[in-house]
Amino acid sequence: MTERSIFDAAGGAAGMTRIADAWHQRVRADPVVSHAFHKGTKPDHIDRLAAYLGEALGGPPRFTQQYGEHADVVRIHSGNGEHDEMNERAVDCFRGALRDAGITDPDTYQAVLDYWTWATWHPMYQFHGSPDDAPAELPMPHWNWDSTVSH
């Protein structure tokens, strides 16, 4: 029997969209994290984030089929210098977004939060010196219930 994915436990594509929308609303209102969005976002930012999050949590490969590669996302988040406070606040916003999106099962909540925290502090922050430091190809990480990544 196949174990249920985190993606499915969090509500599938609709759940990912609720999470992405709630996070987007929270970070746009946060006085520190909103700085990352001061130049605006793509009109489909919420859908892109939902697709990316879904793929990383065991859903279909919608992000890589429609929008780009993991390396593209890492480069977008690279070269911004050290910003520990922004990362901490972004994770706090995500905690609230999970609640706003109705993720009430404790195991699902924790699994999604653990992924987001790992992604915030590792691949999205790893190349804070320059986006040119990010490799051209990086496999999409796939998070599981054991809080480990496979590619």
Regions found by a protein language model. Name each.
Residues 2-6, 17-106, 110-113, 118-119, ...:
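Heme-based O2/NO sensor domains and their adjacent alpha-helical segments
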Residues 6-9, 103, 136-139:
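Surface/interface-facing alpha-helical segments and adjacent flexible terminal/loop regions used
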Residues 125-151:
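Acidic/histidine-enriched, glycine/proline-rich intrinsically disordered or flexible terminal extensions
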